[in-house]
Amino acid sequence: MKRIITILCLAACLQGAWAQNAVENIRQRYNAMKELIASHSGEADTNGADNGTFYHLTGTFNLPATGFHTEDTYLYFEDEEDPTEEKIYLPHRLTFATTRYNFAPRVYYEEYLYDADGRVAFIYAYDPMMAFDDDEQDMQYEFRFYMEKGRVVKTIVRKKSYDEEAFRNVWQGNQLPKKYERAHSSLVANAAQLATLFKDIEKRTYSYAE
């Protein structure tokens, strides 16, 4: 019995160390990407990245009931090198995406970090009006989901009322609580849509890399 308990404890420790290492790697990649964008944020021609490393899409139109609506999306990419082939035009790989949009006066913001296989590895999202419990008033929420090969390894959820200045933690852990599964699934779907959009743009603007 003691041996089984020891093995289980060891497995739990190894699992925790693996998850922590995955989170740290994601944070390093995320910080490096944000530093790259910030280092070029003053350049009008690049607007946050070196020339040729992003697509910028904007849309503006009127929606029934909510009125004026705008979407502002950046898709950042890098060359995907293949040591087995020599190509003049290297294929591109989506690395990071940001999108800001509104419904009426409410402004939403999301960030997506992708791994080398094209899977979303990190999600940050700000939702200006959300409630998870029947007796809860609408609050402002921040979500951070860290993922390794599609599996959530860390979740951070913060919220604040419209009268509060700072967000406060309501959940932080290595699991994805059931009450936040729907929000997570919706954001993962958004990440997949942006990845598909990137591929469609590449087919039109960078087809000679094939």
List each model region and its residues.
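Sec-dependent N-terminal signal peptides
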Residues: 4-13
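Sec/Tat signal peptide C-region and signal peptidase I cleavage site
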Residues: 15-19
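Long terminal segments
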Residues: 20-78, 135-210
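Mid-chain, structured segments of secreted extracytoplasmic proteins
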Residues: 63-104, 108
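Short, solvent-exposed coil/turn segments at beta-strand boundaries
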Residues: 88-94, 114-120, 146-153
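Mid-length scaffold segments of soluble, non-membrane domains
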Residues: 99-125
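Short, solvent-exposed aromatic-acidic interface loops
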Residues: 100-104, 125-132, 157-164
